[in-house]
């Protein structure tokens, strides 16, 4: 019986970063899907079983904190917040919104 690779969802509007992360994680045995905004994230989550979401803080439209709060309201899916900002306040807010 073969083991199914964990499925990760990267949500980030930076296509170059998504490509880099996707290639790296795929080489390490993960299945990876990519969304560039909240709408794409919702579509992927509805269509597939995902084991972990890697969510950017700064997205066009709804930001990562809003998406994290919405996801946390209906799911216990692990969420890792990803950001280029190193502001302690944003980290605290992310944890309060339910990021892991």
Predicted regions and their residues:
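N-terminal/domain-start alpha-helical segments
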Residues: 1-100
